[in-house]
Regions:
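A conserved, well-ordered hydrophobic junction motif at loop->secondary-structure transitions
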Residues: 41-42, 46-82
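Non-catalytic linker/capping segments at the edges of enzyme domains
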Residues: 1-58
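Hydrophobic beta-strand-centered segment that forms part of the acyl-chain substrate-binding groove
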Residues: 77-119
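HotDog/MaoC-like acyl-thioester-processing domains
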Residues: 1-12, 110-164
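Conserved beta-strand residues within beta-sheet cores
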Residues: 27-29, 48, 101-105, 119-121, ...
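Exposed regions on extracellular, virion, or secretory-pathway luminal proteins
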Residues: 39, 60, 109-111
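Hydrophobic residues in beta-strands and at strand termini
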Residues: 49-51, 108, 154
């Protein structure tokens, strides 16, 4: 697994997301990585997250909206990482390659227990310059609890506040 999280390479001006922004101390601060040294579109991405009690749906189980948020942020982070790799650029170099969610589809497979560390695995389905499709599985205790598909598109210049 790589040592620097994808989200930690985002410019400070683009690091306020509630789900994964390093500058949002109230948020989840999800951290995504390459699962191995195979850092390409055939590689897998990974993240871990342990839900706090405030994300309880009913006693003992995680709120589904949290799972959707984690899938979303792991998908867009994975999209950014593969875009940098495809461009033969180091993650975090300017101009930024940030992706935003164009579509998110989540299926809840099994109840997600509280108290367990969640593991998110991202698999690339489609990789293009301005569009990346990532399939994400969320597991707890080695049981798949949710699956999601993120269609991530390159962030339009109108959303960028970074001067290169």
């Amino acid at each position: 697994m790589s040592e620097v999280a994808f989200q930690d390479c985002y410019p400070d001006e683009l690091s306020h997301c509630y789900g994964c922004g390093k500058n949002n101390t109230a948020g989840h601060q999800l951290k995504s990585y390459w699962q191995s040294d195979n850092q390409n579109s055939q590689g897998l991405t990974i993240a871990h997250y342990t839900p706090e009690a405030c994300y309880t749906a009913i006693p003992g189980f995680v709120y589904g909206g949290l799972l959707a948020s984690l899938i979303d942020c792991h998908g867009t982070g994975s999209a950014a990482a593969v875009a940098f790799q495809q461009a033969n650029r180091a993650m975090g170099t300017l101009p930024p390659l940030r992706f935003v969610t164009a579509a998110l589809n989540v299926s809840y497979i099994a109840p997600t227990p509280m108290g367990a560390e969640l593991e998110l695995i991202g698999t690339f389905i489609e990789v293009k310059e301005k569009k990346v499709v990532v399939e994400i599985t969320v597991s707890a205790n080695n049981v798949i609890c949710a699956k999601g598909t993120v269609i991530a598109v390159k962030m339009p210049d109108s959303m960028l506040n970074v001067k290169c």
